[in-house]
Amino acid sequence: AIEKSATDELKQLYLPHLSSGKWTGTMNLTEPQCGTDLGLSKTMATPNDDGSYNITGTKIFITCGEHDLSENVVHLVLARTPKAPEGIKGISLFLVPKILPHKDGTLDSPNNVKCGSIEKKMGIKASPTCVMHYEEAKGWLVGDLNKGMKAMFIMMNGARLFVGIQGIGLSETAFQSSLHYAKERVQGKLP
């Protein structure tokens, strides 16, 4: 989404760090009151004089929303500006880093991005799924105003592919482990 929709300045600052794995990224769509109907989103983006926005709201089910595996976590957050149209047509996409970087990519100060909690899950425990709170966190528009879903779906389509690949990999590993166990098991075999 950043590569296809962000400004050149955002691309130059964020993509090298994200591509190298030095920083990681998330998608922030779902809110406590809206899952599939993102038109009900309440997260707000208030414009600042310098071209940035203050992002305020809560997002849930954020994969890898908080961790210490990278230097920074860059959140792509769907939010609504004050005069945006109602529903899905009023949603914009914003880049909101956990730690604000300097223009040269070195890290500056923490942004107002907080992890409210980490979900207790049955599976995929190595991936923290978080509730994220944005309290006037500084963010930048990615793509066009009120066209956030178009920009977000670039990333979502890639994520869907990788989730499918992950499922195939896990099922193949489970099958191979079960097959190995069944072949090596002594109990129940006839002499």
Where are the language model's segments positioned?
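A glycine-rich, basic-preceded beta-loop-alpha segment at the flavin cofactor/substrate interface
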Residues: 61, 100-116, 121, 128-159, ...
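A short core secondary-structure module
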Residues: 52, 56-110
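Glycine- and acidic
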Residues: 1, 26-28, 56-62, 72, ...
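Active-site lining segments that contact anionic ligands and/or coordinate catalytic metals
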Residues: 22-24, 40-42, 50, 72-74, ...
